[in-house]
């Protein structure tokens, strides 16, 4: 029996339930409470906010836990790669006495004091918090202020966040740019961008459940970035099915010839810094296209 793809994509494009939104709000509130209860962290300039699909309202039920960023605003790590000769001194930054390592350890203590030792697991990049009594399922990311300088001026930078995994290295992220660009894309496509993101995410999850291995390496955020890349005119079809097919077709045909970026338009979508590659994406897109045509 063939699938009614128009009705299926209409259903899959809908936002997650109000329960899912409440889940994100509750997680944010409980993480803030944990920080406010910490004698050390409560005195510091810290921002707590959701990021990723829950904030963007593109999450689907099968997405991972709520992603909560805990950012220490007074600690800064800068990327000067675009401005040869730029350094901390020219940026008017001083060596901090309170380090990222101390911050992450203090956050771990605060979370365990709030949710219990068994409710908090320390990962390489984030804390996995599962506390049934508080109804919290969240990935809590300890971050500091990240800056990307574009000119030799202490105020000439793009602000983001930065994390330092336990395994080493530095990762810059751009949550505000992700959010604002996603909002603008949704407006420019007549509110169709987020609909199609959710539809294709659920298509990916459906394929994974059916045993298609090509769907499994494709995370939620990558799907969102891919749909963002598609030009606005490909969202103007007269049906959900047409718009989904337009996006898949465009991405498959253009992926080899393009240096694409994430939604933030700062970080390259492909490269050694990412956990995915173009071959995996092409295989997924081909699987998705073939599945729609054959069913």
From Swiss-Prot:
The record marks 173 as: Important for uracil base recognition in acceptor pocket. Disulfide bonds: none annotated. The keyword Nuclease does not apply. Its cofactor is Mg(2+). Residues 1-25 are annotated as: Disordered. It is an enzyme of class 2 (transferase). UTP acceptor binds at residues 51, 67, 124-125, 139, 173. GO terms for biological process: defense response to virus; nucleotide metabolic process. Pfam families: NTP_transf_2. Binds 2-3 Mg(2+) ions per subunit; the third Mg(2+), liganded by Asp-65, Asp-128 and Asp-139, is only seen in complex with a substrate analog. It is unclear if it is physiological. Mg(2+) 3 binds at residues 65, 128, 139. Mg(2+) 1 binds at residue 67. Its EC number is 2.7.7.-. It catalyses: 2 UTP = c-di-UMP + 2 diphosphate; UTP + CTP = cyclic CMP-UMP + 2 diphosphate. UTP donor binds at residues 53, 59, 201, 220. Belongs to the CD-NTase family. E02 subfamily. The (R/Q)xW motif controls pyrimidine nucleotide specificity in the donor pocket, while conserved Asn-173 is important for recognition of uracil in the acceptor pocket. Cyclic nucleotide synthase (second messenger synthase) of a CBASS antivirus system. CBASS (cyclic oligonucleotide-based antiphage signaling system) provides immunity against bacteriophage. The CD-NTase protein synthesizes cyclic nucleotides in response to infection; these serve as specific second messenger signals. The signals activate a diverse range of effectors, leading to bacterial cell death and thus abortive phage infection. A type I-B(UU) CBASS system. Cyclic dinucleotide synthase that catalyzes the synthesis of 3',3'-cyclic UMP-UMP (c-di-UMP) as the major product, and of 3',3'-cyclic CMP-UMP as a minor product, which are second messengers for cell signal transduction. This is Cyclic dipyrimidine nucleotide synthase CdnE. It comes from Legionella pneumophila.
């Amino acid at each position: 029996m063939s699938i009614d793809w128009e009705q299926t994509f209409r259903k899959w494009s809908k936002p997650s339930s109000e329960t899912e939104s409440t889940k994100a709000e509750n997680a944010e509130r409980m993480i803030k409470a944990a920080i406010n209860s910490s004698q050390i962290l409560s005195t510091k300039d810290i921002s707590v906010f959701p990021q990723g699909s829950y904030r963007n309202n593109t999450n689907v039920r099968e997405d991972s836990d709520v992603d909560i960023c805990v950012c220490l605003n007074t600690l800064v790590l800068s990327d000067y790669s675009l401005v040869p000769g730029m350094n901390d001194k020219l940026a008017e930054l001083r060596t901090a006495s309170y380090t990222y390592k101390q911050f992450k350890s203090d956050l771990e203590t605060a979370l365990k004091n709030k949710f219990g030792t068994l409710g908090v697991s320390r990962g390489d990049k984030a804390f996995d918090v599962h506390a049934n009594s508080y109804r919290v399922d969240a990935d809590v990311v300890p971050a500091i202020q990240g800056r990307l300088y574009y000119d030799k001026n202490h105020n000439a930078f793009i602000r983001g966040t930065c994390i330092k995994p336990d395994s080493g290295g530095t990762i810059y992220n751009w949550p505000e740019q992700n959010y604002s660009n996603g909002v603008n894309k949704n407006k420019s496509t007549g509110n169709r961008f987020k609909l199609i993101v959710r539809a294709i995410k659920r298509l990916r999850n459906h394929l994974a459940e059916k045993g298609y291995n090509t769907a499994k390496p494709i995370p939620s955020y990558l799907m969102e970035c891919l749909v963002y890349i598609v030009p606005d005119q490909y969202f103007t079809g007269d049906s959900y099915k047409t718009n989904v097919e337009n996006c898949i077709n465009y991405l498959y045909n253009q992926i080899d010839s393009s240096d694409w970026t994430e939604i933030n338009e700062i970080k390259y979508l492909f490269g050694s810094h990412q956990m995915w590659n173009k071959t995996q994406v092409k295989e997924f897109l081909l699987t998705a296209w073939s599945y729609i045509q054959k069913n």
